[in-house]
Amino acid sequence: MEVVNTIGEFKREHDMPVNNGSREREVLTHISKQLPEDLEDFGRVLYRSIFDISKAYEAMYKEKDSPLYKAISNLINADPAPFPKRAIVACQGREGAYSQIAAEKLFEVPEIMFNNTFEGVIRMVTDGLCEYGILPIENSTAGSVNEIYDLLVRYNVHIVRSTRVRVDHQLLAAKGTRFQDIKTIYSHPQAINQCSHFLSALKDVEIIPFDNTAMAAQKVAKDPTRTSASISSKSCIDLYNMEVLAQDIQNFDSNHTRFICIAKDARIFPGSNRTSIMMVMSHKPGTLFSVLSKFNATGANLVKLESRPIPGRDFEFMFYFDIELSIYDKKFASLISELDHCGEQFKYFGTYLEII
């Protein structure tokens, strides 16, 4: 590492970038010529790993001058105010929505404002109507909520907290409704997916996606025909004076949804150790491996890797990463700012604490 440090100092003194792709290709070509054919691939992988470890070490010092490094360092070193107990919070849906349950778990005294759509929640935050917004990002049964990932790329908001909420779905209907009379069931697509085993056993029942589980309950509660039902939370039973036709109909007993708390401005509250980022990398062999090597070199724990298609670019993808690394680790800010230079596009969503 002394040699790496010497190279790093030379680059800093001469204002040279940490990454030097042409020089790396020269070295790899030279190594390939020195090795037997059956060892060429292994040799290139070995030297790429050496390059990645070396660049991660160099970046600890070189990246201190980058705007992103300074911005993250300022957030870390800012006055460590605790996460607020009271706030005006935007949630999607109506009273009884799972987003409301998440908000009440994150804030002791939330003043909740509802919006019909996820995008509407984000706009309430960016327009300054609410200080924070609550959005579901993934479920342990149905997977990621892809719409949220797409919205995070489009809007300039920041994740400042997250939590997990146990989700127990109930089949609800207006008072006096009989199970055998049900012809239509409404709910959010994620809830429908999470209850697919129960729903697949029903005959002659139409399943209709709805914007929100609580909004579905509100609609069904007003149905004069008594032929519809909703998949909703237990909170909706009393809120909308509903009948429980079937309890806990989710596919698995352990069914949890992760919710993120977003804010207009980036904040890093004390105890934060989970970071979310997005990258678009060049469509070349080894680029994803190179990024993963940087996580390994800095001791960052990769807890989530998600890919999403890039609109207008056939079979090319953007990648979402969640990593765990203490904000007080001196490698943290340099890792994030180094990743900023590793792809075609990079976005830092935030560093936060997850409440279990």
Residue ranges and their predicted role:
Residues 1-356:
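Domain-level signature for soluble enzymes in the chorismate/prephenate branch of the shikimate pathway
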